[in-house]
C-alpha cells in the first residue's frame, strides 16, 4: 500500500511517501522537485510492519503533512537504500509490475541481473551516476563503466553470431563475459530506476543476454542446455513496453 503526503508552508515544500506491505516498508522524502532520500526497513512479520507504518504516518500528519492523492509516482527516479541494497519497493512501479519473478531481486545468482558482483556493481554505479547526472545516456554507460572507470576493455554487443562470440572468447574471455553481464545489468537497471528504457539500450541488453547464452554453450557451462534464467530475462525484456 502506498500513501503520499505533502508539506507546504512559507519556508518549506516537501514530500514524503511510504510503501508498506508484507514484512517491509520503504519511504522516500525530500524537497518537492528533488529525487529525495530512500530508506527501507524489514520486519519479522506483517503486523510489525503495519504498526511501524501507522506510527510513521501519524507522526507526519501531526507535523502538518497532508495526504496528496495526485502525487505522481511514475515520473520519478527510484534508488535503493544504500544500507539495505536491492529491494523491490525501491524500484520503479513499471519495473515492479513487469519483472515479477524473484530472480530480479536475487542477490546471489550469477546469471540474474544484479546477482553477480558485476551486476551489483553496475547497478550501484548507475544509480550514483544518475543522481549526479539525471540525463545520462544509459546506453553509453556499460562502456563508460568498464573503460573509463575501471580501465578495462569493453566488447561491443554488435554481433550475436556464434562464430563471432566464439572468436571474442578466444581472444579475451574475461572482457567478453564481463561486457555481456554489465550490459544487461545496465538495461534492467535503467528500467528499475526510471521505469523505461531507451530503444538502443534495450537492443544492447537483448544482444548481451543472447551472447551470454551462447557463451554458456561455447564454454560448456552447466548441462549444455540454454539457461532458463537467461531465457526468462530475454522474454521479459522483449515484452517490456516502455521505451523512449
Swiss-Prot record:
<dbReference type="InterPro" id="IPR016835">
    <property type="entry name" value="UCP026317_WGR"/>
</dbReference>
<feature type="domain" description="WGR">
    <location>
        <begin position="1"/>
        <end position="78"/>
    </location>
</feature>
<dbReference type="InterPro" id="IPR050458">
    <property type="entry name" value="LolB"/>
</dbReference>
<protein>
    <recommendedName>
        <fullName>Uncharacterized protein YfeS</fullName>
    </recommendedName>
</protein>
<dbReference type="Pfam" id="PF05406">
    <property type="entry name" value="WGR"/>
</dbReference>
<dbReference type="InterPro" id="IPR036930">
    <property type="entry name" value="WGR_dom_sf"/>
</dbReference>
<dbReference type="InterPro" id="IPR049809">
    <property type="entry name" value="YehF/YfeS-like_WGR"/>
</dbReference>
<dbReference type="InterPro" id="IPR008893">
    <property type="entry name" value="WGR_domain"/>
</dbReference>
